[in-house]
């Protein structure tokens, strides 16, 4: 899969979120679709529609390709995707309205509530509703997380003799660390939040995380951009990344050369959610696609792309389980409890990081 592309989907700063949230016009759709149909009825109507058009769900992202292929084989659905960011997906839904060319999209969890508030989504809970954690779904089914990411450490063992297992290990180490551009990158901002959580903070108190990275900067240990190219060249000692990126990068470069762990004191988990376009021309194929994404087969497809399934009860094959980190590594990882507070905090991070961390750059 295109791993580099995977983390770039998260390069959405608070500016894009706040701009979208401020632009709702409250208009409604003339395209009324029943979302309480049985799965049998949805399947019948989906086969009649025959096509599902997605946005932000390309073949190369999280192994979507197998899900689209299987929907084609099992239900004779044709598929087309237009790749774009979460913000662009919502803008497209809103701009096109009744002239919709997209039926379903995949967005960062922060964009789910915005899409609902802007009246752009069609609710559908699926057969797996009770297995989805409360934090990972809208109460009415307007958005549902399909897979998660948790902040992890990716260590180049050629450069670091004892790979860090905890934030405390990094604090006491002498190697360089990379999180990327925290002024704009969603992944880097979550890395700061994860560090904050480990040292007593939370989504409304990011200061412990800022202090952690400021100390690294003062020591000249905060370096570089954690790209595949830089990692391959050996320019990064420890990268702090989503677990799916760490695992994907390791697979892409050299399985034996890199160590991947979830920090033992704690980390933060976030996710990506499907949204069904309220104005969709093929609403039932979109519902069926969401249903399939949350099925055992759909969840396994995502896991093959190193994305961790949202359903804990899903039965993955042994070969696919081996692609992911052990479940016990996640025992101290937790999701953002208050998305609105986190949204406000992300607006403050660029200035805090610039004034308290980057100022010490060496």
PLM regions and their residue ranges:
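A bilobed periplasmic-binding-protein/Venus flytrap-type ligand-binding module shared by bacterial periplasmic
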Residues: 152-159, 192-198, 270-282, 293, ...
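Short, polar/charged alpha-helical segment
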Residues: 39-52, 57-78, 249
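Extracytoplasmic ligand-binding site segments that recognize negatively charged/polar headgroups
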Residues: 53-68, 80-94, 98-236
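Conserved C-terminal helix/tail region of periplasmic/extracytoplasmic solute-binding proteins
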Residues: 331-362
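Periplasmic-binding protein-like
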Residues: 176-184, 292-316
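A ligand-binding cleft/hinge motif common to bilobed small-molecule-binding domains
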Residues: 110-116, 232, 238-257
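C-terminal motif of bacterial Sec signal peptides marking the signal peptidase cleavage site
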Residues: 19-22
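Bacterial signal peptide processing site
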Residues: 24-26
